[in-house]
Amino acid sequence: MGRLFVYDENMTDERAKITVAKMAAVSDIVASEKAFIQYSAAGQLTVLAGAVIAVGDAIFQTEETTLSAANLDGASSFAHGKDYYIYLCNNGKDSSNEVYLISENSTFPDGVEWDDTNTRKIGGFHYGFVRNVDEYGREVNTSGSVRGSGWESNVREDIAPNSVWTALHRPKCDPSGMAYLGNGLWADIYLASDDGANGLQSVYNATPITGTEGLNWYIANEKAARVGKRLPDLAEWLIAAEGSPQGLDGSNTNGWTATTNTARTAVGKIKNAISVKNIMDIAGNVWEWINELCLDPTAASWNWYNVMSGYGQIYMPSQTALHALIGGGNWGDGVRCGSRAVVCDHCPWNVSTSVGVRCVCDSL
């Protein structure tokens, strides 16, 4: 390791010279507001002024700027269910201010002039369904009444405001397909699906992973950990679920819940099936493992039970006494599905085709 800067009042030592390249080398992103990119209107974001960002060997200070589909690197409009990434680009001209591009590419924008040396990913967002809420974040109908007539369908297609992230305001894991719940916690917008690498992902229109793929509570935790996520506890899950409509016996209008359904379905397809935190399918489709355990209060035969062959034994008051909570409801549970629906009788080693998982992650 060598010295990058030294003191030399005569400036004969190159290390004494302060250059843009040197400043860029020691700079990261400095901003008074971590969330320096924010949702501002339908289909629009605002970059706040004053953030200092190094891009390659250049340094920019942001001016207040509105971003929209006009900043896309290819298409003319945002596509439903897609994750987008925001790039600050250096076109190499000292006379030019920063250039912003929005791309579906997670490495650098499309265009022969752009690569990882002259662009920097500074944020992103998800585009999909958004539940309309009042100033307190409560579910309302089109007249503004909390849970007033027709509130369930008061949903629009837009940038999910709480999915907007920056390099400073984001989860510790990959932020794709996630939304901010508050208090330093992010949640998957969609039920988890197999990422093809023995982990989990939050992706629109995917098939939710369940016991059909061998999932139980233990395996759900392991797969979540591989991608830097975890299972929510009950309080966290309830926050994510708030404002998602109760299921219906005879219809899939408010979620994949009709009692005539026979199997899970692709995630994110039902417009009304969304919470005030813009979390999809949390009531219906498949139950969700929760990081909350309890014991059967009626059991009294304490002993070692070999319920997980090859993984050790559990000392508990019966062979099925240890339970892990599941929440939300499944495809055929009808009115039993909802934002506070919980079942307390599933053993964590159970492999059920109707139980999946949704992950959360703490803020960086």
Which positions does each model-derived feature cover?
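Short, low-complexity N-terminal tether/leader segments at secretion or assembly junctions of large
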Residues: 1-19, 114-134, 138
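Glycine-rich, flexible loop motifs
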Residues: 18-81, 92
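Elongated alpha-helical scaffolds
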Residues: 78-101
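Residues within well-ordered beta-strands of beta-sheet-rich folds
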Residues: 85-89, 186-188, 277-278, 358-362
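Acidic glycine-/aspartate-rich tracts in secreted/extracellular proteins
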Residues: 90-96, 191-194, 244-245, 292-295, ...
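Short aromatic-cysteine micro-motif
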Residues: 132, 136-280
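Cytochrome P450 core scaffold surrounding the K-helix E-X-X-R motif
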Residues: 197-198, 290-305
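Disulfide-stabilized, aromatic/cysteine-rich ligand-recognition loop
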Residues: 213-215, 311-364
